[in-house]
Curated annotation (Swiss-Prot):
SMART domains: Fn3_like. It holds the Pfam family Fn3-like. GO terms for biological process: cellulose catabolic process. Its EC number is 3.2.1.21. It comes from Aspergillus fumigatus (strain CBS 144.89 / FGSC A1163 / CEA10) (Neosartorya fumigata). It catalyses: Hydrolysis of terminal, non-reducing beta-D-glucosyl residues with release of beta-D-glucose. This is Probable beta-glucosidase M. It is an enzyme of class 3 (hydrolase). Residues 1-22 form the signal peptide. Pathway: Glycan metabolism; cellulose degradation. It is found in: Secreted. GO terms for cellular component: extracellular region. It comes from the Eukaryota. Keywords: Carbohydrate metabolism, Cellulose degradation, Glycoprotein, Glycosidase, Hydrolase, Polysaccharide degradation, Secreted, Signal.
């Protein structure tokens, strides 16, 4: 909202809303007062309590803030210019030995500097389904941030969640499922902060498309940012879920998003900031704007916003003036400053932390101090992370692994490395369907990060060919290349691009599909690798008899080629699973294929109605009984696994609602009480060792037929059997009760499914609550 509304004014506000909302549907809306009341006001902004592990940090912070002048408090709340390459800076307070803060992009590696690594993207981590690996990636990636003097890592991403198939930033997040995203964001936050680098989990909340994400001008008239309109139940059960896991892990900051939520801008929305984040979830850190996402002054502060980036025109001295005239309580400013300083103490950045921005030159091409962020100890994690995010979805006639080929033919624009590797790689002012000039290892925008090197597929293949005495022919520019008929295999490389600022033009492109079909027409063993920054439909050629193997290679980071060769030659066994659903045709995504566009009467105030509720991705496909090309959770291996021995413990009989308790970070602590345990046995029935992702889905009464509620990735040697266990807590088994405003256990029969994917579930059972 553009104005601050207190609880006392709620009745009048809602009355106004009821009048406005009765306006004729064909009457163009020209004022945002029409929407007042759609996002309920929640005031005042709750003060941080220093609960749990935050107690010591809050005690120090309150003592620190008590010594500040009003101007010094204000300076903590907004970014300032600094002679460094940080994405944003908070000014120092030298007299109290506070050196300031450097905050920098992004969740997949440090951007805009040198001597750092390009890590597998969030989507790639999601495809690995590996919690331990996600944590190790976070630890080592954050260590690079620390060495460079970055206090706050602007990530990880769990918004967007992937509601819109063509959304431009889906690749930065982990998955289209809240449980998988939540499990991985927990490990990422916990891992990064274990080395003293604060995370800024983003984009809070409902930032599900890039189209109209910011206000803009249309024929000289301002068009507001898109409003994501959602009900309370869907908010909790889908989009808030992974943010709750991030808060539970202790995320030091949360970035509010550009879009509007129920027609109130995300960074001045008192319901989402004061109500959900700070009250219900017990968030102890600070809420930071996305860059340029501040659209109100004092109203934003009262709504729960704590920090503006990269600078502000509406706060500054206006905050102290507002306190003087009573528009804002002095306690609100104290709380803003306390939350920021408490997070600094919570990360132990007051002791032995590099100077903010020490390794972040403002100009990489001017003389600057060499600060090495990389470390040799991260090599294994970089490579393993790159390997495990590849998903093998087709492997007819055991085309893979390759078997001592004498001749390989390599085709496709995605096989080669870039012609130049520079600062701010992949920041484009548009979104092409493909990156046609080189292999794709990261998406575009602020999530794109600098690489120490790029190991392209063609380079890695030729290194292996040298070792094996294999001949390699290649044509990486032609759409209809010639093929030597004696070749053992044709390796075709294509990609699917996505970037911040733009939604994708489609889920496939004609040029790449034509290339695959042309090669397959001439080559009986065509193996396709797709570096995809999101869902890529393959219906044009997936059933071609000469397309023998297909790999969704996602965005593996700088070790792209090296990782791929490990898989192609069988030194590594594919273990990735799809973190999204691949449809047979794009139209199967229905209304969630494209972003929402402005329509009459809301042309000046674009609306995106989340009226599908929780039914996105596999939930939607299950509900409509649509057969997917490759379902959520699907992925092949060079071995095979059998499932048996399903066991379900006697559930702990529990009250419908969680017992009352003081809110901790993450919410009511009883949400994490275990109710029931499920276990199963997995046997490797093949000839080689492999890793399997065992997946648990639960059918909650009165909910979707199946929802992911557990997964474990286990290594199993050939012929061996291992057991997996899934502990189900109260939140896992609850639905959101809108009237009671509580998580509610349902009375009835819960269905249990365990297996290889969301639609390959050989073990079934049930229990009753």
């Amino acid at each position: 909202m553009h104005s601050n509304v207190g609880l006392a004014g709620l009745a009048g506000l809602l009355a106004t809303a009821s009048v406005c909302l009765s306006a004729p549907a064909d009457q163009n809306i020209t004022s945002d007062t029409y929407f007042y009341g759609q996002s309920p006001p929640v005031y005042p902004s709750p003060e941080g309590t220093g609960t749990g592990s935050w107690a010591a940090a809050y005690a120090k912070a309150k003592k620190f803030v008590a010594q500040l002048t009003p101007e010094e408090k204000v300076n903590l709340t907004a970014g300032t210019d600094a002679n460094n390459g940080c994405s944003g800076n908070i000014a120092a307070i030298p007299r109290l030995n506070f050196p300031g803060l450097c905050v920098s992009d992004a969740g997949n590696g440090l951007r805009g500097t040198d001597y750092v690594s390009s890590w597998p993207s969030g989507l790639h981590v999601g495809a690995s389904w590996n919690k331990a690996l996600a944590r190790q990636r976070a630890v080592q990636m954050a260590t690079e941030f620390r060495k460079k003097g970055v206090n706050v890592l602007l990530g990880p991403v769990v918004g967007p969640l992937g509601r819109v198939a063509e959304a431009g930033r889906n690749w930065e997040g982990f998955s289209n499922d809240p449980y998988l995203s939540g499990a991985l964001v927990y490990e990422t936050v916990d891992g990064a902060q274990s080395v003293g680098v604060a995370t800024c989990t983003k984009h809070y909340i409902l930032n599900e498309q890039e189209t109209n994400r910011n206000p803009g001008m249309e024929d000289g008239v301002e068009v507001a940012a898109v409003s994501s309109n959602i009900d309370d139940k869907t908010m909790h059960e889908l989009y808030l879920w992974p943010f709750q896991d991030a808060v539970l892990a202790g995320s030091a900051s949360i970035m509010c998003s550009y879009n509007r939520v129920n027609n109130s801008y995300g960074c001045q929305n008192s319901k989402t900031l004061n109500g959900l984040l700070k009250t219900e979830l017990g968030f102890q850190g600070y809420a930071m704007t996305d860059w340029g996402a501040q659209h109100a002054g004092i109203a934003g502060a009262n709504a729960g916003l704590d920090m503006v980036m990269p600078s502000t025109e509406t706060w500054g001295a206006n905050l102290t003036t507002a306190i003087s005239n009573g528009t804002m309580d002095a306690s609100r400013l104290d709380d803003m400053a306390t939350r920021i300083i408490a997070s600094w103490y919570q990360m132990n950045q007051d002791s032995d932390f590099p100077s903010p921005g020490a390794g972040m030159p403002s100009d990489m091409y001017a003389p600057h101090q060499r600060v090495i962020g990389r470390d040799a100890s991260s090599k294994q994690t970089l490579l393993r992370g790159a390997i495990e995010g590849h998903v093998l979805v087709k492997n007819n006639h055991s085309a893979l692994p390759l078997k001592s080929p004498q001749l390989l033919s390599v085709f496709g624009y995605d096989a080669k490395g870039p012609n130049a590797l520079k600062q701010n790689f992949n920041w484009l002012s548009y979104s092409p369907a493909i990156q046609e000039n080189h292999t794709l290892w990261v998406g575009g925008g602020s999530g794109a990060n600098n690489a120490a090197y790029i190991d392209a597929p063609i380079d890695a293949i030729q290194r292996q060919a040298y070792e094996d005495g294999t001949s390699v022919l290649y044509d990486i520019s032609s759409e209809d290349p010639e093929v030597d008929p004696t070749t053992d295999a044709c390796l075709v490389f294509i990609n699917s691009y996505a970037t911040e600022g733009w939604d994708r033009p489609g889920l496939a492109d004609n040029s790449s599909d034509t290339l695959v079909k042309n090669v397959a027409r001439k080559c009986a063993n065509t193996i396709v690798t797709i570096h995809n920054a999101g869902i890529r439909v393959v219906g044009e050629w997936i059933d071609h008899e000469n397309v023998t193997a297909v790999i969704f290679a996602h965005l593996p980071g700088q070790d792209s080629g090296r990782a791929l060769v490990e898989l192609l030659y069988g030194r590594a066994n594919p273990s990735g699973k799809l973190p999204y659903t691949v449809a047979k045709k794009a139209e199967d995504y229905g209304s969630l294929l494209h972003p929402s566009l402005p329509e009459t009467p809301y042309g000046l105030f674009p609306q995106s109605d989340f009226d599908e509720g929780v039914y996105i991705d596999y939930r939607a496909f299950d509900r409509a009984n649509i057969t997917a090309q490759f379902e959520f959770g699907f992925g092949l291996s060079y071995t095979s696994f059998d499932y048996s021995g399903l066991q379900i413990s006697n559930p702990k009989q529990s009250p419908q609602y969680p017992p009352s308790a003081a809110i901790q970070q993450g919410g009511n602590p009883h949400l994490w009480d275990n109710i029931v345990t499920v276990s199963a046995e997995i046997k490797n029935t093949g000839r080689v060792a492999g890793a399997e992702v065992a997946q648990l889905y639960i059918g909650i009464p009165n909910g979707p037929v199946r929802q992911l509620r557990g997964f474990e990735k286990v290594d199993v040697s050939a012929g061996e059997t291992t057991q997996v266990q899934f502990a189900l807590n109260r939140r896992d088994l609850s639905t959101w009760d809108v009237e009671a405003q509580q998580w509610s256990l349902q009375r009835g029969t819960y269905r249990v499914y365990v297996g290889r994917s969301s639609r390959d579930l050989p073990l079934t059972g049930s229990f009753t609550l």
